C-alpha cells in the first residue's frame, strides 16, 4: 500500500469545466507604464526521479506552499517508455496536466481512458478519491503538472474530469508576445475553464526584445515557471533585475499591481507560464498523494484506501491495462 501511496507525483487525471468569471483585473498590456509585484523568491528546479523511472524538476515543494496557497506542487516532467506513473491514488485536491511534447495516456478505476497530446490540458478534481495511471504515449513525453488545493467543503466531492484540446485553448498575439489562456484572462480573451479554486494559468512566449505586464487580482498569490530562456533573457518585475534561467520558479510578493516581464535576449524567445490563484487560507496536511486539513483526516484517508471504502471501493480490484 505505501508503495502506491508514495507515487505522489502523478500526471493529472480528472477535471471539470464551467464558464469563467469576467474578471477585468486579469487583463494584460505590452506597454511600459506599470509597477510590478516584487520577486521575493527564486527556486531552480533540480532533476529528481519520480514514479517508475520518470524524471521531474520539482518547482514547488512544501517549503513554497505557505507563500503560494492554493498551490501545492509544480513538476516539469520528462518520461519515456517503459517508465511512467503506474496505478496510484489521490484525494483532496485538483491537478492540471499540460503536455508540452509527446502524449500521456490516462486510465482510472471509474472506467475513463484517454490520451492527451502536445498543447492539450487535462484538469482533474480528485475529490473523495481516485486511482489512476498515467503512462507515456510516445518516445519523448514532456509537460507540466500543477497541484491545486481544494477547500475543506470540496475535498470529498465526487471526482470528475474532462480534456481540453490545444485547438480549444484561446490564444492571442501582440507586439511580439503570444499567450495561451489555459485559465483566466489575458489580452482581452478568456478561457472557458472555471476551476473550483479560482486560478489563472497563462502560457507566454516573448520574442527577443518583447515585454508584457499581466494584471493579477490583488488578493491572489502568483508565480512564474520559466520553460525556455536565452542568455540574458528572462527579466522579471524590474527591467534592471538580473535575468533568471530556464527551469526556475519566480515567486512574486503581494500587491495590487500585476507582473512585468522582459525578454532581453537578442536571439532567443522566452517562454514561461504565469500561474496565480485565490488563497484558501486553511491548514494543509499532506501525505504523499493525499491532501487534507488535519492529521485525523489523513489517517482516515489511508484507512479508506487500505480497506477500499469511502471513495476507494475499487482499490482492491482495479488494475490499469
UniProtKB/Swiss-Prot annotation:
It is found in: Cytoplasm, Cytosol; Nucleus. Disulfide bonds: none annotated. Fe cation binds at residues 88, 90, 132, 134. Its main location: cytoplasm. Disruption phenotype: No visible phenotype under normal growth conditions, but mutant plants show increased resistance to infection by the bacterial wilt pathogen Ralstonia solanacearum. GO terms for molecular function: metal ion binding; peptidase inhibitor activity. GO terms for cellular component: cytosol; nucleus. Keywords: Cytoplasm, Iron, Metal-binding, Nucleus, Plant defense. Pfam families: Pirin, Pirin_C. One of its GO terms (biological process) is defense response to bacterium. It comes from the Eukaryota. The keyword Nucleus applies. Gene3D superfamilies: Jelly Rolls. Belongs to the pirin family. Involved in susceptibility to the bacterial plant pathogen Ralstonia solanacearum. Stabilizes the xylem cysteine protease XCP2 by blocking its autolysis. This is Pirin-like protein 2. It comes from Arabidopsis thaliana.
